[in-house]
């Protein structure tokens, strides 16, 4: 797909920042996770490569099934959250993950570490980062909104 086509698609879908995570992008995370735990993919829609990737490697993960992530509470039956949130809602996702008090991993751009509000949140609540040594290409073999 040409750069011009990407820009045109982005312009027609400006209200949507939906990007499907390539399945192989969960691999670096797996060594930090316990196979005896159940994880929640908060943005799994009709298909989720995060769900299929975890399943393929023998991890227990459940999708949202259309449930609004912001209705989730600490007592829900999962041990941690793993998701690629809509970038326009990354602050809300971060705050809600911290409020639930469960471990979480969010796929976010490195620039998400910046900002006074987020910086303060990370300083107060703590954070760890797993930085990939490659740039994730959300446009290869997947349908994106841009």
Predicted regions and their residues:
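Class I S-adenosyl-L-methionine-dependent methyltransferase catalytic core
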Residues: 1-146
């Amino acid at each position: 797909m040409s750069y011009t086509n990407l820009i045109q698609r982005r312009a027609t879908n400006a209200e949507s920042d939906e990007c499907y995570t390539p399945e192989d992008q969960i691999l670096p995370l797996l060594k930090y996770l316990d196979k005896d735990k159940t994880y929640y993919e908060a943005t799994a829609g009709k298909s989720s490569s995060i769900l299929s990737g975890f399943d393929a490697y023998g991890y227990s993960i459940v999708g949202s099934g259309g449930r609004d992530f912001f209705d989730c509470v600490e007592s829900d039956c999962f041990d941690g959250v793993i998701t690629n949130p809509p970038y326009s809602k990354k602050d809300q996702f971060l705050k809600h993950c911290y409020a639930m008090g469960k471990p979480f991993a969010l796929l976010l751009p490195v620039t998400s570490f910046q900002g006074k509000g987020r910086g303060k949140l990370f300083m107060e609540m703590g954070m760890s980062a797993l930085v990939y040594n490659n740039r994730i290409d959300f446009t290869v073999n997947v349908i994106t909104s841009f």
